[in-house]
């Protein structure tokens, strides 16, 4: 399962602090869908390294989300990279690889299982972008027998931008971990 020559449990640590404003909505949409929110945000993403391994970028984004019967969720984001001077830009062209937008779909199969897919696109003539497929499964039960906030998180990623250091290399990555949700 783990081979030191080809596997690294913590190969990269990327940081992504952000600030956002979310406007809740309750608008009814066709076919039973509900528009749940819209928002705007500012995000900085960095790998925290020094040159020549340094990678970072800043962007602003618009987002929205809708749901159907608390079982299906569709969210979308469009972003614009904030310009940097050519001599301080760690990763020119990152938008052409990581993308300029994403669409996520989540399906709550039952109270213990959620399936998801996220698609990123450069929204340009190139065919770069990525796809991430995810499965989250509840682990155990919560306090006093209630719903557990712990999930086994399994993901398969294919495309560009899985990590900042390799943003311009196409990769396929299988991930397994634990997530905290609904706390």
Give residue ranges: language-model regions.
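Outer-membrane pore/translocation modules
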Residues: 1-113, 117-126, 156-160, 166-171
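One face of beta-strands
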Residues: 15-17, 129-133, 176
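Residue-level detection of beta-strand scaffold positions
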Residues: 61-63, 134, 151-153
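Glycine/small-residue-rich hydrophobic helix-like segments
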Residues: 116-150
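Outer-membrane beta-barrel "beta-signal"
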Residues: 133-137, 154, 171-183
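Hydrophobic alpha-helical segments
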Residues: 138, 142, 157-163, 181
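C-terminal membrane-adjacent module
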Residues: 149-158, 162, 175-177
């Amino acid at each position: 399962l783990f081979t030191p020559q080809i596997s690294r449990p913590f190969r990269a640590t990327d940081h992504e602090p952000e600030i956002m404003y979310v406007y809740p909505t309750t608008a009814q949409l066709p076919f039973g869908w509900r528009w749940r929110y819209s928002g705007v945000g500012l995000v900085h993403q960095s790998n925290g390294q020094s040159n020549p391994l340094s990678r970072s970028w800043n962007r602003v984004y618009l987002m929205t989300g809708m749901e159907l019967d608390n079982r299906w969720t569709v969210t979308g984001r469009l972003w614009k990279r904030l310009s940097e001077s050519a001599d301080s830009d760690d990763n020119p062209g990152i938008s052409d690889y990581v993308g300029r937008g994403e669409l996520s779909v989540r399906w709550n199969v039952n109270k213990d299982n959620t399936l998801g897919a996220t698609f990123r696109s450069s929204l340009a003539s190139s065919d770069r972008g990525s796809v991430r497929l995810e499965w989250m499964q509840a682990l155990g039960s919560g306090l006093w027998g209630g719903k557990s906030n712990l999930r086994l998180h399994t993901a398969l990623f294919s495309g560009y931008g899985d990590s900042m250091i390799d943003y311009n290399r196409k990769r396929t990555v299988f991930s397994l971990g634990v997530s905290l949700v609904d706390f």
